[in-house]
């Protein structure tokens, strides 16, 4: 089944008329291709896909470090200073990249603003085609290259790179087109006699600032791509730990036909780039994924400037940040399923997903069996470089993360409320490696049950379960513990228990899972995001997110003229 889309078409010859001088002269109904999720490849031993990916990994390694410039005014710019993105599995260089100065950022902003009028008036059919083409390029020509850069640069194994930099990135671009089509189709449903009412979804007046994280290549593409799809111009600052893959995504968009100055690519020191952006009066929106503390700081900086009347418009602020995501396991749960899902949720990509499982509350009556399986599975996970396909876990992203997590492990050795069940070791001799670590705590208020760690450390508490009231109480404890509200899962076969958890935990997670892990949201299936300290919950992978990057204009046109000033009620 295909769906209709209202598209602006260049149909009139160029004359002196106003209509013919724009790209919005006529309207026609089109149909976009059917949108489906990108099929996953599995990279089994001996498969052609594994061979192709291994070749891309070897080629990327031979060509390292990749030299990444700034892209300003459609031109590649080498700055006077450069920085290095390191491979977290080896400490070797993945890319050297230009470090944007305040002057560079100012030039990027001005270039973006110059492109705004042309891009904003480009028919949606043309804008949509860029992103559909980019998705096809990622799916085919560049699939293994973008995966290889993600694996080398961000420490993901083959499967994690596949579901991120290949599949999810394609899904963001394709479903974005579908959601934009649906948004544009939302028009007034009633028209008085002789009146035509309509709504125009205008791009924001100014530019969008996209700050992307290290942990998902797809998020980088979406943070810059979603506003651009809606006709906005973007200044994109990628994470210093994801430069190589993000650079390739930008190049793919250009190859797909994106005008070169619509998205400005400006890697650099966060403080200097951000200050220059936020000081500009045409700053129109922030699109952010990263830490809660950084987002709060940015929110405050923007608010201060709003209070001072700095901006032309009130900036939109869209952010997805951290989480302290839970698994709640009822005594009726399938224990094996709960254990396997917990190990996957906690240790896939070394626990560096904002949705990663980091705290578990399990019924005491099944705790021993559950913990035995979790500990056994955690101990069996192979840890090492992603280029070895047998490794389930790779390195954590950088030295700062490694140091923080190693300190947690060291401090836990002297904590009487923690029992080490698996892991508890680390190694930085070649790469930043933390063994998958599981603790059992006797304290339901232990700090490790509230503090976001962003690494492969899982803490489990066994709660009393003599009565069903105990289950409701532990659900209330989860809801009241910690400041986040991103993801969470409940495991139970008892439907009444599921109903209790669903009700009590209604605000504890923006993505709530039943009998499955707290990670793995799929574009087009589970829109992603949370509230509380986890962000603005605008739901990546949904039409709601796109609505944040348009400014509506209501238009009323009357076809019947009015010739009398007085109303009937004014008559004598």
Curated annotation (Swiss-Prot):
Keywords: Mitochondrion, NAD, Oxidoreductase, Proline metabolism, Transit peptide
Active-site residue list: 320 (proton acceptor), 354 (nucleophile)
GO terms, molecular function: 1-pyrroline-5-carboxylate dehydrogenase activity
GO biological process: cellular response to amino acid starvation; proline catabolic process to glutamate
Residues annotated as site: Transition state stabilizer: 215
UniProt-annotated location(s): Mitochondrion matrix
Cellular component GO terms, alphabetical: mitochondrial matrix
Pathway the protein acts in: Amino-acid degradation; L-proline degradation into L-glutamate; L-glutamate from L-proline: step 2/2
Catalytic activity: L-glutamate 5-semialdehyde + NAD(+) + H2O = L-glutamate + NADH + 2 H(+)
CDD domains reported for this sequence: ALDH_F4-17_P5CDH
Chief localisation class: mitochondrion
Class of the enzyme per the UniProt entry, highest EC level: oxidoreductase
Documented EC number(s): 1.2.1.88
Residues binding NAD(+), per UniProt: 300-305
Family affiliation: Belongs to the aldehyde dehydrogenase family.
PANTHER family referenced in this protein's UniProt entry, alphabetically: DELTA-1-PYRROLINE-5-CARBOXYLATE DEHYDROGENASE 1, ISOFORM A-RELATED, DELTA-1-PYRROLINE-5-CARBOXYLATE DEHYDROGENASE 2, ISOFORM A-RELATED
Protein name, as recorded: Delta-1-pyrroline-5-carboxylate dehydrogenase, mitochondrial
Lineage, highest ranks first: Eukaryota, Fungi, Dikarya, Ascomycota, Pezizomycotina
């Amino acid at each position: 089944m295909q769906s209709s889309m209202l598209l602006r078409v260049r149909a009139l010859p160029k004359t002196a008329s106003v209509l013919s001088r724009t790209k919005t002269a006529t309207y026609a109904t089109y149909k976009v291709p059917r949108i489906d999720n990108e099929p996953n490849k599995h990279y089994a031993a001996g498969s052609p896909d594994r061979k192709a990916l291994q070749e891309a990994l070897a080629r990327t390694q031979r060509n390292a470090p990749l030299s990444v410039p700034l892209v300003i005014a459609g031109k590649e710019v080498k700055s006077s200073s450069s920085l290095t993105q390191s491979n977290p599995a080896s400490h070797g260089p993945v890319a050297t990249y230009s470090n944007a100065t305040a002057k560079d950022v100012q030039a990027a902003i001005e270039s973006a603003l110059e492109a705004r009028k042309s891009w904003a008036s480009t028919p949606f059919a043309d804008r949509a085609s860029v992103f559909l083409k980019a998705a096809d390029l990622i799916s085919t020509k560049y699939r293994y290259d973008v995966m290889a850069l993600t694996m080398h640069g961000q420490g993901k194994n083959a499967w994690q790179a596949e579901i991120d930099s290949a599949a999810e990135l394609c899904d963001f671009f394709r479903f974005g087109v579908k959601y934009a089509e649906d948004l544009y189709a939302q028009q007034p449903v009633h028209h008085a006699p002789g009146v035509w009412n309509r709504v125009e979804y205008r791009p924001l007046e100014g530019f969008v600032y996209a700050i992307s994280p290290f942990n998902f290549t797809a998020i980088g593409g979406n943070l810059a791509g979603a506003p651009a799809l809606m006709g906005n111009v973007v200044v994109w600052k990628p994470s210093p730990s994801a430069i190589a893959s993000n650079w390739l995504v930008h190049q793919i968009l250009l190859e797909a036909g994106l005008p070169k100055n619509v998205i400005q690519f400006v890697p650099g020191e966060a403080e200097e780039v951000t200050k220059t952006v936020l000081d500009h009066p045409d700053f129109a929106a922030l699109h952010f994924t990263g830490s809660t503390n950084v987002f709060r700081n940015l929110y405050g900086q923007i608010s201060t400037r709003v209070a001072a009347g700095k901006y032309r418009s009130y900036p939109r602020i869209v952010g997805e940040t951290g989480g302290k995501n839970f698994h709640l396991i009822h005594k009726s749960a399938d224990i094996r399923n709960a254990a396997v899902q917990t190990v996957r949720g906690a240790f896939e990509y070394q626990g560096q997903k904002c949705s990663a499982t980091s705290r578990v509350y399990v019924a005491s009556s099944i705790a021993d069996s559950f913990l035995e399986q979790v500990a056994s599975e955690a101990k069996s996970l192979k840890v090492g470089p992603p280029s070895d396909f047998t490794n389930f876990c790779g390195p954590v992203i950088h030295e700062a993360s490694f140091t923080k997590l190693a300190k947690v492990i060291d401090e836990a050795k002297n904590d009487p409320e923690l029992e080490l069940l698996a892991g508890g070791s680390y190694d930085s001799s070649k790469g930043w490696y933390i063994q998958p670590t599981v603790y059992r705590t006797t304290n339901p208020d232990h700090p490790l049950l509230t503090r976001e760690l962003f690494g492969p450390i899982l803490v489990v508490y066994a709660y009393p379960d003599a009565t069903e009231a105990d289950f409701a109480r532990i659900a209330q404890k989860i809801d009241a513990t910690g400041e986040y509200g991103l993801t969470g899962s409940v495991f139970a076969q008892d439907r009444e228990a599921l109903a209790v958890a669903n009700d009590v935990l209604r605000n504890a997670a923006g993505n709530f899972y039943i009998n499955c892990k707290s990670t793995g949201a799929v574009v087009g299936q589970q829109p992603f995001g949370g509230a509380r300290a986890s962000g603005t919950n605008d739901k990546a992978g949904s039409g709601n997110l796109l609505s944040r990057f348009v400014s509506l204009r209501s238009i009323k046109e009357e076809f019947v003229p009015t010739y009398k000033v007085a109303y009937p009620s004014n008559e004598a």
